[in-house]
């Protein structure tokens, strides 16, 4: 159900459309002020944990030690690994890296990886985007005489038994919203100085992990977009469809899904190859690998769309949906959970059966429901981690019924009706300039999303039908709008629709800008 939000006054010194949207999505004036403020400069942490990590790496160079970078298979983990690999190479430290197979090995530093590192002659391991829960692997490293630097941003639940932990909780307040790549960037800076390509990787990773775009995370993302537009990191540019200008939305919906696809579709590709792709300067190799990445992403889309449709039919009226399919690819659980969460406007867990008797999967939440806090107290997890808006978990099949009962028991704690709101647009507030101003405020915090607007009875409506989408062209206050309804929204197109709800953006194609609406609903 949609609620029409009518806001009479604009309390901010911006276009009426922008000010009213900000009033709708947040009452936090401090955060709104930060979004409206001029872009800030990137400043690097001087925290002791960062400097201690840097000093240990410098010592490794002096001693001619071999350093193993232990990464992760999602966008943030791959970008973190690439940042650390590039930095150690440039500084002259002997190093290698390894990202585990999502299905066969699971998340984080594993005991067998530590054992293999010992066989290969590594004396120091640095984790990136993981490590705060790798207790068994850290213990094994101590037994084998290998030192471990944990560089991570995930929530710390128990003390991490390492001498050097580099983590936002131990850094200045400005860095509290960093992803794993943001943490890796701090170490990189003190080894090789500021490198624009590394800023791009860290900014893209922050978007990939949906980090709150405040404090030092905000200029990091803004600079990443700017440097990508200026031509830095051509490997990432090759993941953007030709003719499209790079912006936050292009990164979120084109670059990041492709970077994530190799980890999700681990039966088709080795995610470790993605680090080579990001760092290679060979254009021919970039072009070849970009095509392969695109192919894998297309396969990921096919699988997730088919399975999402099947699981949507199993949705019941629960506050937290628990959907199980034993034949589902583990790597697409989070994608499907996110899609269903957006559709039903409730938290959703999507789980599958892996080798043996283990059930694993991912969950996604909605603003106002902290999924991590809601689920963290179940006593029979084999593995559990995440944050407010997302989680990953593993339980033995014999404990799955107990888990379902546990979720059912916490229903009342999160059973809140969160209606979807859309700002009703007054015709005189709508202009090309206003939508341009709105785009300059990106990236939006995840709790704001890209705010929905409600356009009622526009003029000059023209309907066009395409294989994967439908388009409506219409005018509002004399401004032309192209409204796009994608097939994967699961909404029936109506050529006679006069009410359109969706998000606004500027679509730049072949140097021509036009107002675009991505339709969320219509009638």
Describe the role of every protein-language-model region.
Residues 4-124, 144, 192-405, 418, ...:
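Hydrophobic helix-and-loop "lid/oligomerization" segment in the mid-to-C-terminal part
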Residues 117-118, 127, 132-211, 217-220:
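Conserved phosphate-handling catalytic cores of large alpha/beta enzymes
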Residues 413-419:
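Non-transmembrane, aqueous-exposed alpha-helical and coiled segments at domain scale
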Residues 423-481:
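Accessory interdomain/linker segments of ATP-dependent helicases and helicase-like nucleic-acid enzymes
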Residues 425-427, 504-506, 523:
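Beta-strand elements of well-folded, non-transmembrane domains
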Residues 478-492:
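Beta-strand/loop nucleic-acid-binding surfaces
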Residues 510-523:
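OB-fold/S1-family single-stranded nucleic acid-binding modules
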């Amino acid at each position: 159900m949609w609620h029409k939000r009518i806001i009479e006054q604009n309390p901010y010194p911006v276009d009426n459309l922008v000010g009213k949207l900000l009033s709708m999505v947040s009452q936090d004036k401090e955060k709104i002020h930060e979004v409206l403020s001029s872009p800030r400069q990137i400043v690097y942490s001087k925290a002791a944990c960062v400097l201690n990590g840097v000093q240990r790496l410098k010592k490794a160079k002096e001693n001619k030690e071999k350093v193993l970078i232990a990464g992760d298979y999602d966008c943030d983990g791959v970008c973190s690994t690439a940042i650390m690999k590039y930095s150690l190479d440039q500084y002259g430290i002997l190093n290698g890296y390894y990202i585990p197979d999502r299905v066969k090995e699971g998340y984080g530093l594993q005991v067998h990886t530590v054992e293999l590192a010992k066989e290969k002659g590594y004396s120091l391991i640095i984790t990136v985007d993981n490590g705060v829960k790798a207790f068994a692997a850290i213990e094994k490293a101590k037994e084998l005489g290998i030192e471990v630097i944990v560089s991570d941003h995930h929530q710390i639940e128990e003390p991490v038994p390492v001498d050097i932990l580099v983590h936002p909780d131990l850094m200045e307040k400005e860095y509290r919203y960093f992803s794993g790549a943001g943490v890796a960037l701090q170490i990189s800076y003190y080894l090789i100085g500021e490198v624009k390509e590394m800023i791009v990787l860290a900014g893209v990773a922050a978007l990939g992990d949906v980090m709150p775009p405040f404090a030092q995370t905000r200029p990091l993302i803004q600079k990443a977009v700017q440097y990508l537009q200026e031509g830095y990191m051509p490997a990432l540019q090759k993941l953007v469809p030709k003719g499209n200008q790079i912006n936050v939305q292009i990164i979120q919906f084109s670059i990041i899904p492709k970077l994530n696809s190799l980890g999700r579709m681990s039966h088709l590709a080795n995610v470790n190859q993605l680090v080579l792709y990001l760092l290679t300067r060979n254009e021919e190799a970039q072009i070849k690998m970009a095509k392969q990445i695109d192919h894998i992403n297309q396969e990921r889309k096919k699988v997730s769309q088919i399975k999402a449709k099947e699981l949507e039919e199993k949705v019941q009226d629960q506050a937290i949906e628990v959907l199980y399919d034993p034949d589902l690819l583990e790597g697409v659980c989070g994608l499907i959970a996110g899609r269903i969460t957006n559709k039903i406007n409730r938290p959703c867990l999507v789980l599958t059966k892996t080798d043996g008797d283990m059930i694993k999967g991912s969950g996604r939440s909605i603003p106002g429901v902290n999924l991590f806090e809601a689920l963290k107290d179940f006593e029979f997890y084999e593995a559990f981690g995440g944050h407010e808006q997302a989680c990953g978990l593993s339980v033995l099949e014999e404990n799955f019924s107990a888990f379902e009962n546990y979720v059912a028991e916490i229903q009342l704690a999160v059973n809140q009706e969160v209606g979807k709101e859309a700002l009703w647009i007054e015709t005189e507030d709508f202009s090309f300039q206003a939508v341009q101003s709105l785009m300059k405020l990106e990236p939006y915090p995840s709790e704001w999303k890209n705010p929905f607007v409600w356009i009622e009875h526009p003029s000059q409506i023209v309907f066009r039908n395409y294989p994967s989408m439908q388009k409506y062209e219409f005018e509002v206050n004399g401004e032309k709008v192209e409204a796009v309804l994608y097939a994967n929204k699961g909404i029936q197109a109506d050529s006679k629709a006069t009410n359109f709800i969706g998000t606004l953006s500027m679509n730049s194609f072949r140097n021509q800008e036009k107002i675009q609406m991505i339709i969320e609903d219509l009638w």
